[in-house]
Amino acid sequence: MLADKLGVSFCETSDNGTGDEHVEVIHDWPSQHTKIGTKEKVPSEVTYQKQGLIWGSLIPPNVQRHMWTKLQLDPTQKGEMVKIVREVSTSSSQEPNKQPVEIIADFLAQVKAHLIKNLDQKFGKVLWRTLDITLVVTVPAVWTEVAKARTLEAVDKAGFNAPEFPQLKKIVMTTEPEAAAIYTIKSLRGMYDAYSWSYSRVVASNTPIQKHSYGLQDFLLHLQ
């Protein structure tokens, strides 16, 4: 299973190999100074220079860049995004014709290339391409349907698809709170009876919580 979390400021990627419970988070993101980073996250930033695209921690200080682009995927965030761009972003002269989906796809393409490099080193270039893969993409809990569709479009444009991952069986999108809950539940498998009791208590009421609980259960079935 591969998991990719594109945050507003940072991105992180992980895998859990052949389905064991150990989750391995990528730490060796390239960095401008050492070429190898030691952090779990990489800045969700890109810049388009004469020599080509530069991304993440490879971008030198004081260089104009696209940042916080993720928020532009959601049309309801438009007003907020204008304010953020004025106060924080220095990307006004960066590829003005580039749309947010294209910019994010360019960034994720670099993430994908680095992920494949790690998979090649860990499993070998041939072996991992024979393994069934589920790609999990997390999004904010308040993400609109339009924003979700644009996120998936960027993921596909970046190459997270069958041509690049021959055994890609499905792409699952879930919200960040649900992903955290799922991780906790899977970590507490030995307490299944307690979880079942809690679940039955939650779904007994006709509230939005009930709908989220069913969604969580459906997602767990996808992962089995």
Residue spans of the language-model regions?
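Conserved beta-strand elements of beta-rich interaction domains across eukaryotes
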Residues: T13-D15, Q51, T76, V142-T144, ...
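Short helix-terminating capping/connector loops at secondary-structure junctions
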Residues: K122-D132, P163-L168, S205-I209
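Conserved phosphate-binding/catalytic loops in two-lobed NTP-binding clefts
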Residues: G159-A179
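Extended hydrophobic secondary-structure segments that form protein cores and membrane-embedded regions
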Residues: R129-P140, K170-T175, H212-L216
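Phosphate/ATP-binding catalytic cores across multiple sugar-kinase/actin-like superfamilies
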Residues: D106-V126, A180-T207
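Short acidic, glycine/serine/threonine-rich loops at helix termini
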Residues: F10, K148-T151, Y183-K186
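Phosphate-binding loop and its immediate beta->loop->alpha context
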Residues: G19-D156
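Gly/Thr-rich phosphate-binding beta-strand-loop-beta motif of the actin/hexokinase/Hsp70
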Residues: M1-E24, L188-Q224
